[in-house]
C-alpha cells in the first residue's frame, strides 16, 4: 500500500480505474503495475452488495417449505385452530409457488388467492399472519382498517399500507413485492346500510372500493417518503399482485346472519323438520359454514369478497386451549416471565390451578389469548417491583388465590441457616 506521496521513482501515482492522483484520494492501494483508490474500492463493494440483493430472492424461492412444514411451524407458536392452519398453509404455499413460476404454468395464468380470517378477538388471527411471515423470511406489515379512508379525506390513505411495507425492507421494491400485508378489523368497514345515502360512506364501503385494486393487483405509485406532500419526489412502482393480503376480523353478529340462512333453508309447513333449541349449532360451527352471501348481508360488497377467495374460520378458544397457550408454545407467556425472573436469579413457578384461573378470567373478559398477558402482569406487578430490592429470594410461586387477588405470591427464601446465624 502506498501513502499520499511519490514512490521511490519520484513519479506521481494514479488510480488505474478512475484516474485520480494519490493527492486526490485518501488511500491508494498498489498491485503489480496497477493501483486502486479507496473510492473505487467502495464503489466495487456497492456493486457486489446490489448483486447479492438480486440473487437473494432466488435462494428464498428454492427453499419454499411444503404445506406440512408450514403447518408444523405454526403448531410451534399457535395452539389449536387446526383447520385454519391447514387452509393457511395451502394458500401460502400456492401463492409463493405462483411467484416462483412467474404467475404462469404451461401457459395457464395462475390467479391470486388472498385470505380472509374470521374469528373472535384473541383467537390468533394476527399471530398466524406474523408467524407465517417469520417462517418465509418476507417483509410483514399490519394495517388497521378502521383508520383507513378514501383518498382525499381525513385519515390514512389505502396506499400508505404499501408505504409501510416498503419501510420494513428499506424501500427494496423487489423484496416488498414478496411481502405479506395483514389488514385487521376488516369487518369494521362493512357497509353501514343497504340503502344508498346522500352522505358518502368514506370509511365503510368507500374503503372497500379503495382496497379492491390494491388487493387484486395493481402497480401502485408510492412516494419514498410517504403521503402526497412532496409531489416532486420520484415515485416507486410496486406491483401489488405479488403481495399476499390477509384480512382479519371478529365479524360479531355474522353467526346470526348464517343462522338465519341455515334455518330458513330448513323449510316450513307440515313437511318441515322441527329442530329443538338444543339442536342449534354453536357460534363456531355456524361460522365454519360461512358463504359469500352471508358476508354480503353483513356489509361487505360482492367485489371485495371476490378478492378474498380463501376463507378460514378461527374458533373461540376454550379454557383448555388458553392453558396450553400459557405454557406450551416456544414463546409461551409463562416461559417469558420465567426468563425475566431468571435474570434476577429467581425461579418462577405457576401452579396448575393458577393457569386455569388465568384462562377463566380471560374467557370472562372475552379477550381470548390477547388478554392473558394483562392478567399475568397484574398478578406479578408488586413482586416485580419489589424483587430487585430484595435479597435471598430463590423462588416465587403463583397459585389460584394470587390470580383471584386474594393473596400475594409466595416467596421462598434461600440460606435460612445464614440468616439465623446473622441474628
Swiss-Prot record:
Q: Which residues form a coiled coil?
A: none
Q: Name one Pfam family in it.
A: AAA_2
GO BP terms: cell division; proteolysis involved in protein catabolic process
The entry's cellular-component GO terms read: HslUV protease complex
Q: Which GO terms describe its molecular function?
A: ATP binding; ATP hydrolysis activity; ATP-dependent protein folding chaperone; protein dimerization activity; unfolded protein binding; zinc ion binding
Keyword field contains Methyltransferase = no
- Entry's PROSITE patterns? CLPX_ZB
Quote the SUPFAM superfamilies the UniProt record gives. Answer: Glucocorticoid receptor-like (DNA-binding domain), P-loop containing nucleoside triphosphate hydrolases
User: What are the entry keywords?
Assistant: ATP-binding, Chaperone, Metal-binding, Nucleotide-binding, Zinc
Provide the residue positions that the database annotates as binding ATP.
120-127
Residue limits of the ClpX-type ZB domain? 2-56
Q: Which InterPro entries match?
A: AAA+_ATPase, ATP-dep_Clp_protease_ClpX, ATPase_AAA_core, Clp_ATPase_C, Clp_protease_ATP-bd_su_ClpX, ClpX_bact, P-loop_NTPase, Znf_CppX_C4
Enumerate the residues binding Zn(2+): 15, 18, 37, 40
Subunit structure, briefly?
Answer: Component of the ClpX-ClpP complex. Forms a hexameric ring that, in the presence of ATP, binds to fourteen ClpP subunits assembled into a disk-like structure with a central cavity, resembling the structure of eukaryotic proteasomes.
The family classification in the record reads: Belongs to the ClpX chaperone family.
What HAMAP family does the annotation carry?
ClpX
* Known function: ATP-dependent specificity component of the Clp protease. It directs the protease to specific substrates. Can perform chaperone functions in the absence of ClpP.
Name of the featured protein: ATP-dependent Clp protease ATP-binding subunit ClpX
The gene that this protein is the product of is clpX
Amino acid at each position: 500500500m502506498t501513502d499520499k506521496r511519490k514512490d521511490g521513482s519520484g513519479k506521481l501515482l494514479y488510480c488505474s480505474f478512475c484516474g485520480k492522483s494519490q493527492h486526490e484520494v485518501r488511500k491508494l492501494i498498489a498491485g503489480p503495475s496497477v493501483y486502486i483508490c479507496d473510492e473505487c474500492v467502495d464503489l466495487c463493494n456497492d456493486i457486489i452488495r446490489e448483486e447479492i440483493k438480486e440473487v437473494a430472492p432466488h435462494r428464498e424461492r428454492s427453499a419454499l417449505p411444503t404445506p406440512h412444514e408450514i403447518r408444523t411451524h405454526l403448531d410451534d407458536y399457535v395452539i389449536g385452530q387446526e383447520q385454519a392452519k391447514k387452509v393457511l398453509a395451502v394458500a401460502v404455499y400456492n401463492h409463493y409457488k405462483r411467484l416462483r413460476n412467474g404467475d404462469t404454468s404451461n401457459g395457464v395464468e395462475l390467479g391470486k388467492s388472498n385470505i380472509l380470517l374470521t374469528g373472535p378477538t384473541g383467537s390468533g388471527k394476527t399471530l398466524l399472519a406474523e408467524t407465517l411471515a417469520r417462517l418465509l423470511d418476507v417483509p410483514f406489515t399490519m394495517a388497521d382498517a378502521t383508520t383507513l379512508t378514501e383518498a382525499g379525506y381525513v385519515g390514512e390513505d389505502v396506499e400508505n399500507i404499501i408505504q409501510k411495507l416498503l419501510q420494513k425492507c428499506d424501500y427494496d421494491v423487489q423484496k416488498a413485492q414478496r411481502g405479506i400485508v395483514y389488514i385487521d378489523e376488516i369487518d369494521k368497514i362493512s357497509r353501514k346500510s343497504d340503502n344508498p345515502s346522500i352522505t358518502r360512506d368514506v370509511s365503510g364501503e368507500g374503503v372497500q372500493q379503495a382496497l379492491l385494486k390494491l388487493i387484486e393487483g395493481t402497480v401502485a405509485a408510492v412516494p419514498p417518503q410517504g403521503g402526497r406532500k412532496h409531489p416532486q419526489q420520484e415515485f416507486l412502482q410496486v406491483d401489488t399482485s405479488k403481495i399476499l393480503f390477509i384480512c382479519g376480523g371478529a365479524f360479531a353478529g355474522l353467526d346470526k346472519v348464517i343462522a338465519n340462512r341455515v334455518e330458513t333453508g330448513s323449510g316450513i309447513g307440515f313437511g318441515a323438520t322441527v329442530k329443538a333449541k338444543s339442536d342449534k349449532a354453536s357460534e363456531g360451527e355456524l361460522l365454519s359454514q360461512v358463504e359469500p352471501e352471508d358476508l354480503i348481508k353483513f356489509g361487505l360488497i360482492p367485489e371485495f369478497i371476490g378478492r378474498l377467495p380463501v376463507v378460514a374460520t378461527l374458533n373461540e378458544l376454550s379454557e383448555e386451549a388458553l392453558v396450553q397457550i400459557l405454557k406450551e408454545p416456544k414463546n409461551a407467556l409463562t416461559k417469558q416471565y420465567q426468563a425475566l425472573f431468571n435474570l434476577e436469579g429467581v425461579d418462577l413457578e405457576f401452579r396448575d390451578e393458577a393457569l386455569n384461573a388465568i384462562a377463566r378470567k380471560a374467557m370472562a373478559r372475552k379477550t381470548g389469548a390477547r388478554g392473558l398477558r394483562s392478567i399475568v402482569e397484574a398478578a406479578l406487578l408488586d413482586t416485580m417491583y419489589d424483587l430487585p430490592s430484595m435479597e435471598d429470594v430463590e423462588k416465587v410461586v403463583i397459585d389460584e388465590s394470587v390470580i383471584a387477588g386474594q393473596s400475594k405470591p409466595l416467596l421462598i427464601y434461600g440460606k435460612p441457616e445464614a440468616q439465623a446465624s446473622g441474628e
